[in-house]
């Protein structure tokens, strides 16, 4: 190969890997700690010692492969089809007048209109988060499903759609945003629950990625919903850091991935702890979420079956 690409023979070339897997390593993943890469979607990575996984096959997740994340470990992968994209979708709905009408204003010039639009759009999610955090947590508020891009895990079904119920004339933008935020956190809990149901303990959560770094509101809510602490990794580019750790092992600087993580890891700069009172309410809300999800899935699956039969007989 060295002759083919004209490199000197002493150059060591490592094989590639998935970005989220390298991100989990860069984020200092530990056995049975769920590394949650949170951006537009999520990629949830968990590793377990190979000898402890004999005879275990987790149903309804994205993948389970020996050595796929760390040598000597079984890598398990799950994820949510829409996470940050859910918040961005709602922001874009609210921003429609700014994107489509502001440039036609006769009060301000075009350059000012563009600057004002960009400034206002940039403030939407931070201000929604601030106002939503002031709302009391209760059992009867608006409820949403986070399936705006289908469901990846557990039990992938890309036909599923998002839903929101409990709307009234008193429902405003912060309340709708709060419902969407809850839905994404409930989606995270459904993944944790699946691992636990399949005999895989989840001892903690490691948060990496854009949403983990930028949204204390979402991270605190997730800690409350999951009922466990969430550690946020200090380094912003954990995928690149993980790639560097693997390169250090390939080049012989460190003998194992674990030793590379210990030497090159940047640690954690924030930790969110669950509020027990809110957790109790969220458990009841989670039951409502699951019931709504079952209803939505039954309606969509029913329509899909009718369409499928019609297509076959046509």
Where are these regions (language model features)?
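Conserved phosphate-binding catalytic cores of ATP/NTP-utilizing and phosphoryl-transfer enzymes
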Residues: 2-6, 17-33
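Structural signature of cysteine-dependent C-C bond-forming condensing enzymes
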Residues: 4-10, 228-231
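Structural motif corresponding to the C-terminal cap of alpha-helices
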Residues: 5-9, 25, 188, 192, ...
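Short coil/turn segments at beta-strand junctions that form active-site/ligand-binding loops
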Residues: 9, 32, 203
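Glycine/Thr-rich phosphate-binding loops that ligate phosphate moieties of nucleotide
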Residues: 14-15, 46-314
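Short beta-strand scaffold segments in enzyme catalytic cores
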Residues: 22-26, 42-46, 144
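Conserved active-site beta-strand element of glycosyltransferases/polysaccharide synthases
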Residues: 36
